[in-house]
Amino acid sequence: MLSAKGVSLGLGLGLGAWGPVLLGVVGVAGALALYGYYKNRNAEPAAAEAV
């Protein structure tokens, strides 16, 4: 766990402390994209029926 270089976060990506940050940003962006996709997909039939 602890080495001469510092604390390893264990992602094995070679990104150091930025690994979890980038993973979190990618996760949040993916969740927002899926949320937007499902929200728009479910809204289309209702909009088509209203016309």
UniProtKB/Swiss-Prot annotation:
Q: Using the record for this protein, list the coiled-coil segments as residue ranges, or answer none.
A: none
* Keywords from the UniProt entry: Biomineralization, Magnetosome, Membrane, Transmembrane, Transmembrane helix
Q: Name one GO cellular component term.
A: magnetosome membrane
Q: What is its main location?
A: membrane
- Which spans are transmembrane here? 9-29
Q: What does this protein do?
A: Might be involved in magnetite crystal growth.
Q: What else is known?
A: This bacteria makes up to 60 cubo-octahedral magnetosomes of about 45 nm in diameter which contain membrane-bound crystals of magnetite (Fe(3)O(4)).
- State the protein's name: Magnetosome protein Mms5
> Which species expresses this protein natively?
Magnetospirillum gryphiswaldense (strain DSM 6361 / JCM 21280 / NBRC 15271 / MSR-1)
Q: What is the lineage of its organism?
A: Bacteria, Pseudomonadati, Pseudomonadota, Alphaproteobacteria, Rhodospirillales
